[in-house]
Every structure is written in C-alpha cells, then in structure tokens.
A protein has these predicted regions:
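Glycine-rich phosphate-binding loops that contact phosphosugars or nucleotide phosphates
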Residues: 41-184, 249, 259-303
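Alpha-helical transmembrane segments of integral membrane proteins
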Residues: 49, 213-216, 309, 313
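Short glycine- and Lys/Arg-enriched binding-loop motifs that mark or flank ligand-binding interfaces
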Residues: 46-48, 100, 209-211, 243, ...
Length: 347
C-alpha cells in the first residue's frame, strides 16, 4: 500500500492495527479477564442499543443473539428507547439491556440506560472501550477493550473489537478458536487486498456506493455505509441484499459500486443480485468467507469459524476503501465534517 499523506494518518494506523488489536482482545477473552457474564438464556428478552456505529453493531449482535441463543432479541437506537420506552420495555418480563458505546459517555445511551432501569428494574451490561466511563459505572457487567481506543472520530478498530466483545457474550465457547484463526486471517486480508482497496477508493469516476448484507451482516453493511459517508462525504446506501431490486437499483449505473457482504446461507440468491448489478454496468465486489459465489470475490478466510466470530473480517477492506476515497478527495478522515468524538447533549 502506498504511503498516505498526513491527513488521515491516525485513521490509517487504526485500520491497519486491527490484527494486533484483535489478538490482544481475544487473548483477554480467552484468559477469562472478562469475568462472569450473564446467562442470556435466563432472560425473557435482550435489547441491544447504541448510537450511530454502535447502533449498527447492535443490529448485528441482536440478530446473532436470537439465532445463536434462541433468545428474543432486538436492536434500537438509544434515542428510541429514551423517547418511546413503552414501545420497547416490558416491565413484567425479565430483560437485559446491552448498551454499546465506544466512549461510555454518549448522552443518549446513558439516558436510555436510566430509562430502562427505572421502568423495568432490569439488568444492564456495557460494551465499551472506556471501562472508567459513566456507562461502565452504571452497568452490572462490563466488557471492555481499552487497548482498542482511537483518536480518530470515525470508529474502525473500536467497532470490530467491540464486535468481539459482543461475540464473547453471545457465543463464548468459540473464543479460543477465534484467537487461533482471526488475527492471522486479518493480516492476510490486509496484505492481499490493501492495494485493491486503495485503487477502488481513489477512483473518483465512481460516485455512489451500495453496501449489501443479509441477516446479521445487514448491520455491518450499514456500518460500511456510514464509514464511506462520514469519512469521504460520498453518496452511500445500505440494503438487505435482495431489497436493492425493489427501487434502489434505479440509481445503479456505470459510476456505481456495489459491495456485497456475502455469506454461506443464501449465497445463490446473493450471487444473482451481484450478477444483476453487473448487467447494469456497476462495478461489483463480493466479500465472502471462502471467495466463492460470484465474480470479483474477496476471500476473507477463517471459513471454519462460526459466523459471529468471522464477521469482523468484512470490515477492514471496506474501511480502507472509505479512507482512500477521503484522501483522494482532499479530506481528512481523522476529522470528519461536523462530527465530534462523543455526542453530548445539553439539558
């Protein structure tokens, strides 16, 4: 990968450091440093909440929670829980709120926790990169990765590290397997496809990006969309794979990029969507565990891992595309327009 300008230096470093950061995070999880955690099966329902990136992480986690643990689970922005608590909270049922915040200081998330505790008296668990923050102090349990903390505004390695923390909560039995396979797969992915990410990101003839994901990967497609939008100020959208046919593909043409976060289940359906977008002249790429299923595939590796542990591999390549596009447009991805590291509300 060619050297970047000083603009975006922190973001680039944080993206490329993910193999080492994951190694540290997984070692922590395997060693038992995370301590005792709640039994998700003992709850009537589990809510995952966050804001922005961590809301998308919540979408991903809730889907895996419901599928892996067979527990009723949902994701919602913290503001929805704060403004419409009666639509979501069940005072007569035993619920767990999993609140996710990089900083542990986001006002909406803190207030959502207060509303949950006041109305349900239920348990709360915090997932964060700041174990000393107010969110961590208000939660019964804390899963934290302080070593992953960033200086950049846009979340990259914190997001994927908090994915690993959520995976430990939902499917802790495979943490050791992930520790053995995931960091090496991330290194190989960055080495093999880093130049491709740069080439796609720097191609300013492309002017719109579509990110597609099925199941839990829809939350990751939304996160990739947000990275492209906030870093590079580019038109970017996220959809469930087959939903792009129901209107959005009217925007697909030779200046569009369609990036599919492909899985094993539903692969034939997803491959057909990618093929359809190719006929509309879009540039297409599919990211999949084994590199099979469609033309222009990126092989993530670690295909033996359960999906919840393998899923972080979808993001480094997509983060790099957004980073290089920002730099090519003369922007500073470390400091996206109008954004701050933490959103704090007055009053």
């Amino acid at each position: 990968m060619s050297s970047a300008s000083s603009a975006g230096r922190d973001t680039r470093s944080e993206i490329l450091s993910q193999p080492e950061i994951w190694e540290t995070t997984l070692k922590q999880l395997v060693s038992g440093e995370s301590g005792d955690l709640p039994d998700l099966g003992s709850y009537d329902y589990v809510l995952f909440t966050g804001c922005g990136s961590t809301y998308f992480l919540s979408q991903w986690a809730a889907r895996h929670c419901q599928q892996v643990r067979q527990v009723q689970a949902a994701a919602l922005p913290a503001s929805e829980l704060l403004i419409f608590p009666s639509a979501w909270l069940r005072p007569g049922a035993r619920g767990l709120l999993v609140a996710i915040s990089r900083s542990a200081e986001t006002t909406e998330t803190l207030r959502a926790v207060e509303a949950f505790r006041e109305l349900t008296k239920g348990d709360t668990l915090a997932i964060t990169c700041n174990p000393q923050g107010p969110l961590a102090k208000r939660a019964r349990w804390v899963l934290a990765a302080p070593h992953a903390q960033e200086t950049s505004v846009a979340q990259t390695r914190t997001f994927t590290s908090m994915m690993l923390l959520a995976a430990r909560l939902i499917d802790g039995g495979h943490a050791a397997q992930a520790h053995s396979a995931l960091p090496a797969a991330a290194r190989a992915l960055l080495d093999q496809y880093g130049e491709l990410a740069e080439a796609v990101g720097r191609d300013l003839q492309l002017d719109r990006f579509f990110f597609l994901g099925s199941g839990a990967r829809y939350g990751l497609a939304c996160e990739a969309m947000l990275k492209m939008k906030e870093m590079s100020l580019s038109q970017s959208e996220a959809y469930h794979f087959m939903e792009i046919r129901h209107g959005p593909m009217s925007m697909v043409d030779g200046r569009a990029v369609v990036l599919g976060l492909m899985g094993v289940e539903g692969r034939n359906y997803e491959a057909r969507v990618i093929a359809d977008m190719q006929t509309l002249q879009a540039r297409t790429m599919g990211l999949s565990p084994d590199g099979a299923g469609a033309a222009g595939q990126i092989s993530l590796g670690a295909e033996a891992l359960p999906p919840i542990w393998r899923d972080p591999l979808y993001l480094p390549f997509l983060q790099l595309v957004a980073f290089h596009r920002a730099v090519a447009k003369g922007l500073n991805p470390d400091r996206p327009t109008h954004l701050e590291f933490v959103v704090k509300l007055d009053g």
